[in-house]
Amino acid sequence: MSLTKTEGTIIVSMWAKISTQADTIGTETLERLFLSHPQTKTYFPHFDLHPGSAQLRAHGSKVVAAVGDAVKSIDNIGGALSKLSELHAYILRVDPVNFKLLSHCLLVTLAARFPADFTAEAHAAWDKFLSVVSSVLTEKYR
């Protein structure tokens, strides 16, 4: 599945706004993930998962930075996220379904933070983009 030129333009355009709030968006997305899907906490037994904790903020920042890497390499997302895919598949052994859960939580966060920008067209583009990201992150599982 690949993005159309229009979808790519939407992603890159919105990213300019998102990147200015990356840390906050990452933290909020993880808080939403852990609240909505508490089973995902099992991958972070060594983290303080209280809302706003330093570890949660740091990991949220990493998550959004990885999304940013995918945006910057929108024509080669696989290349941009290959090492991250290996890490999650071989070392962390994260269940692939969690990427979809995280993607959904990011979509909700973006919709809440950017209601004027998050039109139906933008929602569809971000959903497709995050599906591509999730697919790339699960490539090494096969």
UniProtKB/Swiss-Prot annotation:
GO molecular function, one term: oxygen binding
InterPro entries: Globin, Globin-like_sf, Globin/Proto, Hemoglobin_a-typ, Hemoglobin_oxygen_transport, Hemoglobin_zeta
Record-listed heme b binding positions: 59, 88
Record keyword Iron-sulfur present: no
Residues annotated as domain Globin: 2-142
Domain of life from the UniProt record: Eukaryota
Gene Ontology BP, a term: cellular oxidant detoxification
This protein's UniProt keywords: Acetylation, Heme, Iron, Metal-binding, Oxygen transport, Phosphoprotein, Transport
Family of this protein: Belongs to the globin family.
Subunit (UniProt): Heterotetramer of two zeta chains and beta-type chains.
Name of the protein this chain belongs to: Hemoglobin subunit zeta
Species in which this protein is naturally found: Pan troglodytes (Chimpanzee)
Gene responsible for this protein: HBZ1
